[in-house]
């Protein structure tokens, strides 16, 4: 559905740049000098974020998790550029200063839209990391983090930074949307989203052992695998906001780049409750982004009741109800102009 306007020629309104997603993990297998490179990692959309330490080359991955996460993001949101920050070598403890430095660079230098962090700790005593997270929110950068890491269970019930108010926490679910048993306990007043986190198949370094019969792929499990999926879904939302008709009104994207706005749309438009009394909302992008037999590409942006226009109005309606009744007015004015020029009528059936 998003393919139709991904290279939109409507340059006056559509944001030129692609959605940018930073992944803080174990690097990616992109250097041919270290062995064969998984085909997807050869993409020019996989880019250096910042070399945080000479001992941590960004284009190498001795653990495999970073390559897996980057592949997940590009599979879910193929429109994005992925910026790689290698914050660890393998299974050793992650230095918080690397994470803080990566966040600061992603926000200030690379101007990313989303940061995916498949990591976490028991406590949040590092002032530099807390400041970086607060700076990211102030700069309208969306932060996603795994709700648990390597079996961490804390008194708070969730790892940090996932439990921070500025961060969207991600739990895991199986292929049917059932919450994984290894998710941490419920945190009071913390929105909980699940994404596929069991048997997640993605790219994997060819020089590392994998049980997958296809070289360069592996199935992995954990909230750390669900996190890049959620980040990719958020990337789809921002890409859609940069296409017509939503791009007619820049304030819509601004709302979506706030943690409150993105949480709202993920809850109301892109997920379903696992059960009435469950704290978990399972993310499913096909709830919002889907096509029909008559509109296999989602339809035109000004076509009444096309899947594209319906998705756009769904987002606008939820934002309007939560934030301001004026949201969508500018978009409506531009659509009226389009209809006056001979576009699809606002009342005509497809």
Labelled PLM ranges:
Residues 1-83, 98-101, 105-110, 114, ...:
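Active-site core segment of subtilase-fold serine proteases
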Residues 13-16, 136-138, 162-163, 185-187:
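Extracellular/periplasmic catalytic domains that process cell-envelope and extracellular macromolecules
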Residues 25, 157-242:
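Extracellular S/T/G-rich loop segment that most often corresponds to the catalytic His/Ser-adjacent loop
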Residues 27-29, 118-122, 148-152, 174-176, ...:
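Catalytic metal-binding/acid-base residues of hydrolase active sites
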Residues 67, 71, 227-235, 260:
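A structural signal for well-ordered alpha-helical segments within the folded catalytic domains
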Residues 68, 88-164, 214-228:
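Substrate-binding/access-modulating region of protease and related hydrolase catalytic domains
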Residues 83, 142-144, 168-169:
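Structural detector of well-ordered beta-strand residues that form the stable sheet scaffold
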Residues 107, 113-116, 239-350:
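C-terminal subdomain of the subtilisin-like protease fold in secreted/lumenal serine endopeptidases
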């Amino acid at each position: 559905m998003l393919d139709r306007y991904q290279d939109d020629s409507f340059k006056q309104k559509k944001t030129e740049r692609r959605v940018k997603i930073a992944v803080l993990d174990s690097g990616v297998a992109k250097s041919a000098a270290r062995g064969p490179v998984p085909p997807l990692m050869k993409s020019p959309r996989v880019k250096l974020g910042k070399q945080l330490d000479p001992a941590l080359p960004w284009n190498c991955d001795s653990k495999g998790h970073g390559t897996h996460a980057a592949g997940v993001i590009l599979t879910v949101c193929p429109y994005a550029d992925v910026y790689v920050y290698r914050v660890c070598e393998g299974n050793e403890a992650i230095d918080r200063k690397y994470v803080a430095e990566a966040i600061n660079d992603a926000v200030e230098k690379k101007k990313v839209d989303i940061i995916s962090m498949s990591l976490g700790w028991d406590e949040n005593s590092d002032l530099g990391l807390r400041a970086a997270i607060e700076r990211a929110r102030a700069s309208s950068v969306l932060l996603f983090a795994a709700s648990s890491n390597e079996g961490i269970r804390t008194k708070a019930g969730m790892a940090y930074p996932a439990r921070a108010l500025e961060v969207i926490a991600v739990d895991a679910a199986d292929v049917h949307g059932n919450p994984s048993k290894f998710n941490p306990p419920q945190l009071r007043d913390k929105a909980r989203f699940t994404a596929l986190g069991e048997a997640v198949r993605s790219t994997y370094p060819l020089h590392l052992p994998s049980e997958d019969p296809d070289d360069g792929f592996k199935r992995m499990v954990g909230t750390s695998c669900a996190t890049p999926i959620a980040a990719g879904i958020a990337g789809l939302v921002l890409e859609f906001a940069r296409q017509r008709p939503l791009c007619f009104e820049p304030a819509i994207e601004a709302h979506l780049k706030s943690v409150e706005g993105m949480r709202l749309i993920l809850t109301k438009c892109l997920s379903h409750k696992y059960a009435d009394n469950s704290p978990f909302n399972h993310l499913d992008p096909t709830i919002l982004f889907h096509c029909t037999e008559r509109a296999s590409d989602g339809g035109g942006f000004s076509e009444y009741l096309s899947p594209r226009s319906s998705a756009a109005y769904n987002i606008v309606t939820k934002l309007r109800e939560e934030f301001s009744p004026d949201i969508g007015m500018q978009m409506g004015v531009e659509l009226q102009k389009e209809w006056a020029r001979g576009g699809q009528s606002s009342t005509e059936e497809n």
